[in-house]
Amino acid sequence: MLIDVTPYSQVSLKHDSSIILLLVYNLLSFSSDDQRSMAMAVAPVESMESLSSDLFYDILRRLDGPTLASAACSCAAFCSISKEEKLWENVCSSMWPSTNREDVRSLISSIGGFRKFYADCFPLIVNKEVTEHQWNNYPEYPEEWTEAEYYGDMDEFESILPSDFVSIVDIRYKDKTICSKVLWGIPNANGFDGWFYNCPFRIDLLTYAARDDENDGEVTLSVSDGLPPIASMERERKDGKLWQELRDGLRLSWIVVNRKIKQAANLASWSPLGGQRHWPTEKDFVLRFGSVLPAKDILPCQVVECILSMKFRVIHTEGEDVQTTLKLTELSMQLEDMEGSHVNGRNSLLILKKALSCRRSKNYSEVLESCHLYSKVQSELKEEKMRIESRLDRIFILGGISVFVMFWYIIL
């Protein structure tokens, strides 16, 4: 999936010139030394050929990804220059600082380059295949699925190795990167018959040092990073300022790359989908990110939720010599089905592979709608199961009473 950098049509030279003038004006506004040349920004441009391609390149290298893609569609000159890998490498480096690492750059080059990597990972996963009808006919594992059906195609599974996957993770707080990590493979997954394949799938990113990781120290946030000062946890319980700042300011990107099939996708929701404050202790704050992934032909539920958990702990409150400081204590990934059960390692590998080729969108509201739809249907399913269990309980109680009455009736 590539960003379309082909012009929609032969845009008129007048429109091209307007775009160029605007970009040149913005370019010159960055430099205080070139203020004398500001008049260039309003000078008429007679033709595209009258401007240097070096100037175009200098303009485009200052743009972010969406703007660069839009500019590439405006004229043939921009379209040609926008194919330069160095431009997209700069965009990816700004968006995901972890891509600055030499080993990650080599990885991205091996799977198609930075332009393809950005096109795959900037849009977020959207899955709207969750319907009420589907969950009203939710099949039970033992009755509806045979063992062969449940475990699917063994040949396909044997072609998937945990070592094929790479996690590229970046955390931002108020546009400042506070953590960048790269995890090669999936820890503790060696051996086909090992416990990994049958036990609940979970990656604890902070537990394992990434290969040649340059950011292996503690990840902290303090007042100097923009956190509000907290005098005491009792006060925070009442006003919740710190909790609100964390929800509004934290952003997570968790990109999964499969080196064998040369595909990548961002499994995070960028902004938090929810969380819990003061849990499990009053000093802990847990934020939940994630996405809804397809599991068709893998699990009976057809879709699962990828849950990315981030936990911060208050290690200092405001005092005379210390600032309010939080420490990142957990960053993990796990998959859960509609009933809240953890997906095992074997099926998780199949789901992750399928997720790398599913539908994505740059429309963030559509991404949120997909996640909220999943939560809504999941809640309805749980309520329906509770109603069924409640009816069964009443039937069992009435049956027990009836047997008890009949027993004494026969005796007497």
Give each language-model segment a name:
Residues 2-5, 9-12, 20-164, 169:
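Skp1-binding F-box subdomain of Cullin-RING ligase substrate receptors
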Residues 90, 94-412:
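Substrate-receptor adaptors of ubiquitin E3 ligases
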